Amino acid sequence: MEAFLTALSGFSDPYLLGVVVLGTLGGVLVGAMPGLSSTMATALLLPFTLTMEPVAAIALLSALYCAGTFGGSITAILVNAPGAPPAAATAFDGYPLAQKGFAGKALGLAAVSSVIGGIFSVIVLIVAAPLLSRVAYNFGPPEYFALAVFGLSMLATISGESALKNLIGGAIGVLIATVGMDFTTGVERFTFGNWALSEGIHFIPVMIGLFAGAEFIKQSGKLDQKRFRVPLDAVMLPTYQDIKTCLSTIARSCGIGSFIGLLPAEGGTVAAMMGYNEAKRFAKDKSQFGKGDLRGIAGPEAANNAATGAAMVPTLALGIPGSATTAIILGALLVHGLRPGPHLFTEQPTLLYSIFLAMLIANFAFAAFGFIGAKVFARITLIPIEYLWPAVFILACVGSYALEQAMLDIWVMIIAGVLGFIMQRFGFSAAPIIMGLILGKLVEGTLKQSLIIFDHSWFGFLERPIVLIFLSLTLLSMSLPLISEMRARRRSAPES
């Protein structure tokens, strides 16, 4: 209770409150820009938080994370160009409704659904994270090794993506994590005689390159592309009848989003698609879906925002990212000298409550910005690409250099950007690479510690019940895509 009161009193400081509000405003703005995303913005902003106090830095990134998820719905509804991947499902019914002249109603419902989902997710975070951290007190290096392997295996289950491509992306991330000197044996790996690489490749320039650099190259080929948006008079609060129609959908999507968010490697995009599909499946009249059904907006918006707080649960309690953005927030914690896991809850309780409060404030703040400033955000989305993306690239270079004032980091960012762009062209996602990069170091470190504990015997893993549970879940998660593919082939066989 004392830690909560200390955290609460911290927000009476105009500086900390201003940081959260600024992060929220930036999140909505970035989320509303097609091509930009809260993940990219978090990666770009992370180096600039190094001079901040840990509480303010993590509160800023957490607020940006929450608000960016909602911000994507603005362009999804007005321009039919989702500002963030989780908002793609919102466009299915949001844009058709806006074309009918109800853009204000669509945005109002999106804001209300997002707030409900976001607050629900923060409650899940407050309740579940401490409970999970208590369980993690029983974890040693073998358990963390098995958990990290399970987290990597979850890449195969991400809905809508190729399981093989996700696993390849994760493997590339793990490979990048091995660059540098092995401090156990003193052997240099993949340094090619360059002493600057002996300490390894820092994950921040890689993150910036994969998200911002790759998107800069991609958008450079769209300089002549014009955007058009539907007219927007004012954002309107949904009526009682609108809420009544969508209430069960919102409640269901809150549960779906929170469950998806709790799973390592899953995120808002998966939750939004599932929220939309379930809203359509439970609807008695499905004829209006795709034509402007309110439930087609409420479902994905509640689900993707419900995933935000839930994705922070494994991030804070176990040190296993729940999504690409939480992987970057995890990186921010590490950069500030904070190790996520059970000890964080005993050693830094004020920081944790500050994160909870920041996310709670951000959810109310982005709704206010959505209602008051939607017309402004809608105009900003029409900024010409030739002005926007050079500025993003400059920020990427400055952010990468600011880390250690080394030109190597800028080159790493550029190479990562080229790699990310090439992989996008072949249908790969950047998120699995980030997950592999973050978890790769954990896998290697805990594996070596475990083998020392077991006197270099691999059979020692089989004597730990929790390890066996995680390894069984790993096999299951790896098998599910294969089973789904086999079922799909069997169904399509009679038709062909």
Predicted regions and their residues:
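Transmembrane alpha-helix interface/packing and boundary motifs in multi-pass membrane proteins
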Residues: 24-38, 68-80, 155-160, 254-266, ...
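Membrane-embedded alpha-helical segments of transport systems
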Residues: 66-71, 112-124, 132, 176, ...
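Re-entrant/interfacial helical elements at transmembrane boundaries that shape
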Residues: 38-47, 61, 76-96, 127, ...
